[in-house]
Design a protein with these regions (language model features):
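Charged C-terminal helix
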Residues: 113-147
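Conserved beta-loop-beta/alpha segment of the NTase-like Rossmann-fold superfamily
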Residues: 5-7
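Conserved phosphate/ATP/ADP-binding segment of small-molecule kinases
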Residues: 13-78
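Short pre-catalytic strand/loop immediately N-terminal to key active-site residues, enriched for Gly-Thr
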Residues: 78-92
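A short, structured active-site edge motif that brings together acidic residues
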Residues: 1-3
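Phosphate-handling active-site elements
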Residues: 78-80, 105-119
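Short, small-residue alpha-helix embedded
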Residues: 88-112
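Internal alpha/beta core interface subdomains
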Residues: 33, 49-50, 98-100, 107, ...
Length: 147
């Protein structure tokens, strides 16, 4: 569920957020909030991890720097995943693409950590290969079919 879009628009009501926090997050294998969503979920990584989901990937794509840092927490163990920022406006749907790729790698039999790292690599390559493709107006999609 997307709570807050990349453009900063809140897409889920406060009541919807509270329902998600209390009822859905404890059932999830992993949650993948972006930084604005993480700020809604809690004031610290520890607070977010206390919501009942064993794995959290906080996505740092909103950072305004050359190297973007995502934070992956698996059963309390924290790792940073760093990727070079690609200069493109074709970033529409990157969060959904990343979470779908994680699910696909899990379905292929990879463990959680390997699935997250493989999905991160896939997304980075999809963004890079689609950086200069012009599709319509505004933020375009990544290139899902780069291989």
């Amino acid at each position: 569920t997307v709570m807050i879009s990349t453009s900063g628009h809140r897409l889920l009501s406060e009541e919807g957020c509270q329902t998600m926090i209390k009822k859905l997050i404890p059932l999830a294998s992993i949650i993948t909030p972006n930084i604005p969503e993480a700020n809604v979920l809690g004031n610290s990584i520890e607070e977010i991890c206390s919501l009942g989901c064993p794995n959290v990937l906080i996505k740092g794509g909103h950072q305004n720097r050359d190297i973007l840092t995502d934070i992956f927490i698996e059963n309390g163990k924290q790792e940073e995943i760093r990727n070079r920022k690609v200069d493109t406006i074709n970033t529409h749907g990157t969060g959904c693409t990343l979470s779908s790729a994680i699910a696909a790698y899990l379905a292929k039999g990879l463990d959680m950590r390997d699935s997250v790292f493989a999905a991160e690599s896939y997304l980075q390559r999809a963004i890079s290969s689609g950086a200069d493709i012009k599709t319509g107006e505004g933020h375009g999609p990544v290139n899902f079919f780069f291989e």
